[in-house]
Design a protein with these regions (language model features):
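Compact, charge-rich alpha-helical regulatory domains located at protein termini
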Residues: 1-41, 46, 52-58, 62-89
Length: 89
């Protein structure tokens, strides 16, 4: 989590433009959903991992289709909002 203190340019995954190459900085889950952290980490959202938003569902933008590493997942906006990312270098 030390990255998050240095990552002033970090934004949450749900706010990305489509096809923008990023990397995971950290995960910040709501207090009422602590189990989301482990679940997101288990499916590959770990610091340094490449991530890209591929598509948004309609209406309302749910779910989001996200590629992390070599895997593709559908996430709800609330879940994607827990993943902080920054531009891939």
């Amino acid at each position: 989590m030390s990255d998050h203190q240095n990552a002033s340019s970090a934004i949450t995954l749900d706010r990305l433009d489509l096809h923008q190459p990023m990397r995971v900085v950290d995960i910040q889950v709501p207090a009422e959903q602590p189990e989301w952290r482990l679940w997101l980490e288990e499916i590959g959202f770990i610091p340094g991992e490449p991530v890209c938003l591929l598509a948004r569902g309609m209406p309302g933008g749910d779910p989001l289709v996200v590629r992390v590493g070599a895997s593709t997942f559908a996430l709800r906006r609330a879940e994607a909002a827990c993943v902080r990312v920054e531009a891939a270098s």
